[in-house]
């Protein structure tokens, strides 16, 4: 009888999917034999595996807008060497930006607002963080990013860095 993981992923027991940071792609690992390989193991239900990878990505690509506040882990940015606004003020400012996105998405693109106001160095790239996998971002940010579908925008997400709004693009 297939294991729960096998029935979800389409992989034969005991195989799992992992992600190679150096090669930037998925690979397959057998924890019993410690064998890893790039190709799907024999006996894989490829349709089920592709559905699983689509529905449960190993990595995502997101844009974000970060507003730091005085209690952020590093209350400084390219915009200000000493950020003094409260967490509530940062949240209120982010709500205003989200409203601007909702009101007229054609003239206020996510990327344009990130360039205009984000406290993250990714502002230069329109808030683009590139592709990342689990364990690479702060847990609250990562959880929100992986729950989004491509094209969706998050509610406000709090992290040690400040308050964010996230858009999944890949």
Curated annotation (Swiss-Prot):
Coiled coil: none annotated. GO terms for biological process: negative regulation of transcription by RNA polymerase II; negative regulation of ubiquitin-dependent protein catabolic process; positive regulation of rDNA heterochromatin formation; positive regulation of RNA polymerase II transcription preinitiation complex assembly; positive regulation of transcription by RNA polymerase II; termination of RNA polymerase II transcription. Gene3D superfamilies: 2.20.70.10, 3.10.50.40. One of its GO terms (cellular component) is cytosol. The keyword Oxidoreductase does not apply. Residues 9-43 form the WW domain. Residues 57-170 form the PpiC domain. Residues 32-53 have a biased composition (Basic and acidic residues). Changing residue 120 to R: Abolishes PPIase activity. Present with 4401 molecules/cell in log phase SD medium. Interacts with the RNA polymerase II largest subunit (RPB1) and with the SIN1-RDP3 HDAC subunit SIN3. This is Peptidyl-prolyl cis-trans isomerase ESS1. It comes from Saccharomyces cerevisiae (strain ATCC 204508 / S288c).
């Amino acid at each position: 009888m297939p294991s729960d993981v096998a029935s979800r992923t389409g992989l034969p027991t005991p195989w799992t999917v992992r992600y190679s940071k150096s090669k930037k792609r998925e690979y397959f690992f057998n924890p019993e034999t410690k064998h890893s390989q790039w190709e799907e193991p024999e006996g894989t239900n490829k349709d089920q595996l592709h559905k699983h990878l689509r529905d449960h990505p190993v990595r995502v690509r997101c844009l974000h807008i970060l507003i730091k506040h005085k209690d952020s882990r590093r209350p400084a940015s390219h915009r200000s060497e000493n950020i003094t606004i409260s967490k509530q003020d940062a949240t209120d400012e982010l709500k205003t930006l989200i409203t601007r996105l909702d009101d007229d998405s054609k003239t206020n693109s996510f990327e344009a607002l990130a360039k205009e106001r984000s406290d993250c160095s990714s502002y230069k790239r329109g808030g683009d963080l590139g592709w990342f996998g689990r364990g690479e971002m702060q847990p609250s940010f990562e959880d929100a990013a992986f729950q989004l579908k491509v094209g969706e925008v998050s509610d406000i997400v709090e992290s040690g860095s400040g308050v964010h709004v996230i858009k999944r693009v890949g």
